A protein has these predicted regions:
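An N-terminus-focused feature that recognizes amino-terminal "leader" regions
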Residues: 1-157, 314-316
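Short, structured motif recognition centered on aromatic/hydrophobic residues
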Residues: 14-18, 32, 37, 51, ...
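N-terminal beta-strand motif that seeds the catalytic metal site of vicinal oxygen chelate
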Residues: 1-25, 79-82, 140-187, 246-255, ...
């Protein structure tokens, strides 16, 4: 991602980790292994496991009587925290509190890092991390080239510390689903605390329901968060998520790949369930995205979606729900900084059709 031109008061520099929890955390670990992640380290004093693929760090928190497990009792399988890389964690935390954020009383053990955190969407946490490998261009092995995992975690013997997996390399973006009327409030939260700016705005209508979304982007250009709410009075897919999750939260995580076809092949071979796309979608690809330069038969074979214009192509595919109502997006960018806007309506309508078939929605257009 290219850096933006506006002020970066916290020195944000991307995502550090995503923290997951569940009543059955073992199932999370099995899912992540299917997705190409490797368990590479264990927390020194807590029941927390670090899974890695490329530059993506997933934590599974199974510590009894912890914030994470209390979160799981309320939400089920869920994302209880995310972490932003910042220049100075202490200063970032202080500034966030001064601007109205709610702090979190982080219980730390002996010789454990105290990583400051504030309350985020749905009472999940946003951690501030200022230690990571390669920060400010520091070379490997140099003094100061240290991460939070070097301090708080012990490597699992024999585990590759830099696994390639299925070729997923970075966290591209994540989304929030919020109650109707709260989208602007959460957008202003990120703008006020982190100086995020609106990168995109969507207002998509299906046959029965609609959705609104503000996509917010950080000054570093590496943290992007579309915030979604229902766009009509009819309860649709956003409300279904809110009901299943018992509140607001993170809807999906988008993971980047440099070769989406290879990644999708790996995921399918590992039995990760991916969303289907009707064949007629591909009959219109060349008309909708002329001169895209991709092999339409190869995209059709793998059910990969395409969007953009010539020289600015985005390829994407979505998993089925994997962690409660949470799913994953696999994305490859070829000069395109969007979110697949051209696919949104098609995807939205396909999910809406599934809801109608399951009886969640009633199709009033046929009555």
């Amino acid at each position: 991602m290219q850096p933006t031109t506006w002020d970066n008061p916290l020195g944000t520099d991307g995502f550090e980790f995503i923290e997951y929890t569940a009543p059955d955390p073992v199932a999370l670990g099995k899912l992540f292994v299917q997705m190409g992640f490797t368990a590479i380290a264990k927390h020194r004093v807590k029941d927390v496991t670090l899974y890695r693929q490329g530059e993506i760090n997933f934590l599974v928190n199974a510590e009894p009587d912890s914030f994470a497990q209390r979160f799981a009792r309320m939400h089920g399988p869920s994302i209880c925290a995310i972490a932003f890389r910042v220049a100075d964690a202490g200063k970032a935390y202080k500034r966030a509190l001064e601007l109205g954020a709610w702090g979190f009383d982080n219980k730390t053990g002996p010789m454990e890092l105290n990583i400051p955190a504030i309350k985020g969407v749905g009472d999940s946490l946003i951690y501030f991390v200022d230690r990571w490998r390669g920060k400010n261009g520091v070379q490997p092995g140099s003094i100061g080239d240290i991460s939070i995992y070097d301090v708080d975690f012990e490597p699992i013997p024999g585990a590759d510390q830099h696994p390639v997996g299925h070729g997923l390399t970075y966290i591209d973006h994540l989304t929030h689903n919020v109650h109707r009327g709260r989208m602007v409030e959460w957008a202003e939260f990120y703008e006020r605390l982190f100086n995020f700016r609106e990168a995109r705005y969507f207002d998509i209508e299906g046959k029965v329901t609609a959705v609104k979304s503000k996509a917010m982007s950080s000054p570093c250009g590496k943290i992007r968060i579309p915030i979604n709410e229902e766009g009509s009075e009819t309860s649709g897919q956003i409300q279904e998520y809110l009901d299943a999750y018992h509140g607001e939260g993170i809807q999906h995580i988008a993971l980047g790949s440099a070769d989406i076809c290879s990644t999708v092949d790996g995921l399918r071979n590992a039995n990760v369930a991916l969303l289907d796309t009707i064949d007629t979608y591909y009959e219109l690809v060349d008309r909708r995205v002329p001169n895209h330069g991709e092999s339409t038969p190869e995209l059709r074979k793998r059910k990969i979606l395409i969007d953009g214009v010539a020289d600015e192509i985005l390829l994407q595919i979505f998993t089925e729900n994997q962690i409660g109502p949470i799913f994953f997006e696999i994305i490859q960018r070829k000069g395109n900084r969007g979110f697949g806007e051209g696919n949104f309506k098609a995807l939205f309508e396909s999910i809406e059709l599934d809801q109608i078939r399951r009886g969640v929605l009633k199709d009033t257009t046929t009555s």
